UniProtKB/Swiss-Prot annotation:
Keyword Metal-binding (UniProt): yes
Protein name (record): D-2-hydroxyglutarate dehydrogenase, mitochondrial
Effect of residue 390 to A: Significantly reduced catalytic activity
Name of the coding gene: D2HGDH
UniProt: (R)-malate binding residues: 386, 390, 401, 476
Effect caused by changing residue 401 to A: Loss of catalytic activity
Biological role: Catalyzes the oxidation of D-2-hydroxyglutarate (D-2-HG) to alpha-ketoglutarate. Also catalyzes the oxidation of other D-2-hydroxyacids, such as D-malate (D-MAL) and D-lactate (D-LAC). Exhibits high activities towards D-2-HG and D-MAL but a very weak activity towards D-LAC.
SUPFAM superfamilies: FAD-binding/transporter-associated domain-like, FAD-linked oxidases, C-terminal domain
UniProt keyword annotations, A-Z: Disease variant, FAD, Flavoprotein, Metal-binding, Mitochondrion, Oxidoreductase, Transit peptide, Zinc
Cofactor(s) it depends on: FAD
Annotated organism of origin: Homo sapiens (Human)
Binding site for (R)-lactate: 386, 476
Length: 521
């Protein structure tokens, strides 16, 4: 039942630790390992070129003269050691592997400019890489592209305490930026499960959505300016810190979501909202998906402006989080669970509104059980149940991941459809995501990669999504995995214009090749 007094956190919620911090703290699994370096005994990831039908384009190969030139541009920032290159060649899901022989670690936009000028002259392909936490293979090479890492471009350049405008380099880690602005009574407008590793430049390049999208919208609205280095080394300065600028084309929008195919983002200007004085989280069990939808409608009506997140997950998600991460549900077992967050300026006012909503939801049968938290520690505990689902899935076997945007009322139908379609051939079929913006994370696990299972999933998932007028990528981007399925979400004319923009800004095609755009539009 919903607590009517201050929450006394049950001891069994912390089972499986030693100690609460070990179980509920910052993830210690793959997300915490940048580049997802192989653990001892882990099977080697097959080369992408051997698993997928892709041919290398006629780029040059890196020579000793190229390495010498790079060493002059970034002294001490040229990595050629094969062991050190293993992790950045492999994607986070451990399903794609390139064979790059060199990684460059510039510190400044000027160094990036010199690198790209040299690569443009020599026709050398470049793979930009941030925290390497992407889900669609956009951040790792397909063949032997040079990896350009932004990891050393990690300085905050300015922060204005009145406007909340942050200017920083692209390699700043999202969690560290969050800590920086929170110390100044602001928050970042996005929050991701991968925040401990992902870079703000990668977030912008992929137009990452995340857990605060419902309240603060997309990066197309919160990013005020960008500095971008084009394929030929030209530095494009669109780094305004103005909230209003109606002079000509808004060029920065081209690069938000372009996944490093049009230019490399080196500096970001972003608007940070004020830090809420009161944050409350409720975790509820629902008897069915229809009740999840009704709870969301009721929630919007009763909570209004203080509603900042509405997440849902199915029972299988909770079972996997418990099995692989030893995190227990704080409510009784239910077919579905929802996590609701409110953020506001008046703790008493917000708690009262949330309490009235919870009483109504329970009394009307929308919710069968629930609990809520107001202090930061317990809030983080409840959020961990949602944020660490991806980690739990990665421990369940090979994962087929789909990031779909669908009409809210049809959001879960594809999950039940696939369970019937796949039967025992899939280990688990789960659905969770951001109900507030119609984003479903559909995941299918199996003991190992299976071509027959993949054939049963694709193109069926994309055809089903197109039939609902949905999108095959809600927030993860396109990368390598989805480049040839854009036609399910974009008309031929739009694809042709994208190809024309790519040819204009990167005529040699050296920036992140084999990604984002179809091989043939």
């Amino acid at each position: 039942m919903l607590p009517r007094r201050p929450l006394a956190w049950p001891a069994w919620l912390l089972r499986g630790a030693p100690g609460a911090a070990g179980s509920w703290g910052r993830p210690v699994g793959p997300l915490a390992r940048r580049g997802c370096c192989s653990a001892p005994g882990t099977p080697e990831v097959p080369l992408t070129r051997e698993r997928y039908p892709v041919r290398r384009l006629p780029f040059s190969t890196v020579s000793k003269q190229d390495l010498a030139a790079f060493e002059r541009i970034v002294p001490g920032g040229v990595v050629t050691d094969p062991e050190a290159l293993q992790a950045p060649n492999v994607d986070w899901l451990r399903t794609l592997r390139g064979c790059s022989k060199v990684l460059l670690r510039p510190r400044t936009s000027e160094e990036v400019s010199h690198i790209l000028r040299h690569c443009h002259e020599r026709n050398l392909a470049v793979n930009p890489q941030g925290g390497n936490t992407g889900m669609v293979g956009g951040s790792v090479p397909v063949f032997d592209e040079i990896i350009l890492s932004t990891a050393r471009m990690n300085r905050v350049l300015s922060f204005h305490s009145v406007s909340g405008i942050l200017v920083c380099q692209a390699g700043c880690v999202l969690e560290e930026l969050s800590r920086y602005v929170e110390e100044r009574d602001f928050i970042m407008p996005l929050d991701l499960g991968a925040k401990g590793s992902c870079h703000i430049g990668g977030n912008v390049a992929t137009n990452a959505g995340g857990l605060r999208f419902l309240r603060y919208g997309s990066l197309h609205g919160t990013v005020l300016g960008l500095e971008v280095v084009l394929a030929d080394g030209t530095v494009l300065d669109c780094l305004t810190s103005l909230r209003k600028d109606n002079t000509g084309y808004d060029l920065k929008q081209l690069f938000i979501g372009s996944e490093g195919t049009l230019g490399i983002i080196t500096t970001v200007s972003i608007l940070c909202p004020p830090k809420p004085r009161a944050v409350n989280v409720a975790f509820l069990g629902c008897p069915g998906f229809a009740e999840v939808l009704q709870t969301f409608s009721t929630c919007k009506g009763m909570l209004g402006e203080i509603l900042s997140a509405f997440e849902f997950m199915d029972a299988v998600c909770m079972q996997l989080v418990g099995r692989h991460l030893h995190l227990a549900s704080p409510v009784q077992e239910s077919p579905f669970y929802v996590l609701i967050e409110t953020s506001g300026s008046n703790a008493g006012h917000d708690a009262e509104k949330l309490g009235h909503f919870l009483e109504h939801a329970l009394g009307s049968g929308l919710v069968t059980d629930g609990t809520m938290a107001t202090d930061q520690r317990k809030v983080k505990m409840l959020w961990a149940l949602r944020e660490r689902i991806t980690e739990a899935l990665s421990r369940d076997g090979y994962v087929y991941k789909y990031d779909l945007s669908l009409p809210v009322e049809r959001l879960y139908d594809i999950v039940t459809d696939l369970r019937a379609r796949l039967g025992p051939h899939a280990k688990h079929v789960v659905g969770y995501g951001h109900l507030g913006d119609g984003n479903l994370h559909l995941n299918v696990t199996a003991e190992a990669f299976s071509p027959s299972l993949l054939a049963a999933l694709e193109p069926h998932v994309y055809e089903w999504t197109a039939g609902q007028q949905g999108s095959v990528s809600a927030e993860h981007g396109v990368g390598f995995r989805k480049r040839d399925v854009l036609g399910y979400s974009k008309p031929p004319g739009a694809l042709q214009l994208m190809q024309q923009l790519k040819a204009l800004l990167d005529p040699k095609g050296i920036l992140n090749p084999y990604k984002t755009l179809p091989s043939q539009a």
